[in-house]
Regions:
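N-terminal pre-catalytic "stem/leader" segment of glycosyltransferase-like enzymes
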Residues: 1-56, 194
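Donor nucleotide-sugar binding/catalytic pocket of nucleotide-sugar-dependent glycosyltransferases
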Residues: 105-140
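Conserved donor-binding/catalytic core segment of Leloir-type glycosyltransferases
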Residues: 143-174, 182-184
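Nucleotide-activated donor-binding/catalytic signature segment of Leloir-type glycosyltransferases, i.e.
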Residues: 185-187, 193-247
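Nucleotide-sugar-dependent
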Residues: 233-271, 281-291
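A charged, aromatic-enriched C-terminal amphipathic alpha-helix characteristic of glycosyltransferases
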Residues: 311-347
């Protein structure tokens, strides 16, 4: 097949939904073209894959594909219509929703990350298939751990409100158990104080009266009294190595229970497991379907579950979690799902073991 991807090329969404599958589709003998703003020329494909809603010109491209009998696939890893006001991308997303819904309806097939999101998307298009986000094993090499216990979080600037969920427990447990708390990726500045200063200089005090600004302020207030190590965001091609270099023993994935988050996937779990860390996540969707170690979204539950993991045999737990990811969320095994739907085989259902894993009660 000649496969053309119409996408931006700088985000984690592109990495998981575009770059990783493209690499392994190429290994299977397919031609994969990345048609982005940097592209200068391309050949007419057998299938065009559109990602999210980045380019208004995509509507014209879809019309051209229709005239030339080219299969159209639309992929999204988020319910963009449910993005909350405190999300960094809220305003930008609102302007793209009409395009998002147009592309959803126009596609011959829609692909996405979880069954929850697939069910949501079927209101626009019945032909939705789940491709779980899948790691590239080539990118992950666990590093030797030191005697210092390291508990941390890695992610994007869209999680200030989510992170705040766990910080009271982190502060209390850190008083009893000596561990280093690590934060990575929530901004590009060299420190969180610099981030706040830059935002204040650029947008003024009114920013901090918005839902986003209030979530940043709440996060910074909760962080007080916690000993932490900070690492800024890195380019997407450096991210796997950066997560491994953090040498986390426990990776946390706090997440508010809201409609947008319920349609996300468990990327943090996959990354932590591949880097050699045990995951502790909020007991909410999507984590409650896959992650073995979860906590209710309150201080006492997070405190209790974190203390349990600090005293547990984390080597064995991590081995089990990494094994599950390598079995069920490995692009080497899952690339056939992409191949089948891109070729037009809508009958290829996702095996149930790829949709979810049984999780013990917390």
């Amino acid at each position: 097949m000649n496969i053309c991807l119409l996408t931006e090329t700088q985000s984690g969404c592109y990495k998981w939904r575009g770059a990783i599958p493209a690499k392994y589709l190429s290994r299977r003998g397919h031609t994969v073209q990345i048609f982005s703003k940097q592209a200068r020329s391309y050949e007419a494909p057998d299938v065009l894959v559109l990602y999210r809603a980045h380019y208004p010109e995509a509507v014209k491209v879809v019309e051209w594909c229709r005239k030339n009998n080219i299969r159209i696939v639309f992929d999204t890893d988020d319910a963009l219509d449910l993005v909350p006001p405190e999300n960094l991308n809220y305003k930008a997303v609102q302007t793209r929703l009409p395009l998002y819904e147009t592309l959803l309806r126009a596609a011959d097939a829609v692909t996405t990350t979880t069954e929850a999101l697939a069910s949501h998307l079927r209101r626009w298009n019945p032909n939705v298939t789940v491709f779980p986000n899948s790691i590239d094993p080539d990118e992950w090499t666990s590093q030797p751990r030191s005697s210092e216990v390291r508990v941390g979080w890695t992610g994007s600037p869209t999680h200030f409100a989510d992170l705040a969920v766990a910080l009271d427990a982190i502060r209390e447990v850190q008083k009893k158990h000596p561990f280093q708390f690590v934060l990575q990726g929530i901004c590009t500045e060299s420190s969180l104080d610099e981030m706040v200063a830059v935002l204040r200089a650029r947008f003024g005090q009114p920013l901090f009266d918005t839902p986003l600004g209030r979530s940043i302020k709440h996060f910074m207030d909760k962080l007080r009294g916690i000993r932490y190590e900070f690492h800024p965001n890195v380019p997407i091609d450096q991210h796997p190595q950066k997560v491994c270099d953090l040498k986390l023993d426990i990776g946390i994935a706090p997440l508010l229970d809201d409609p947008f988050n319920r349609h996300k996937s468990c990327i943090k779990y996959y990354e932590y497991a591949m880097s050699g860390a045990v995951t502790l996540a909020s007991h909410v969707l999507p984590y409650s379907t896959e992650v073995p170690n979860t906590a209710k979204n309150n201080r006492e539950s997070w405190k209790r579950k974190l203390e349990e993991l600090l005293q547990a045999d984390r080597t064995a737990l991590c081995r089990e979690q990494r094994s599950w990811v390598m079995t069920h969320r490995n692009i080497e095994k899952n690339v056939e799902l992409w191949e089948q739907v891109f070729a037009g085989d809508q009958g290829s259902a996702l095996p149930m073991e790829l949709v979810s894993s049984p999780v013990e009660a917390y």
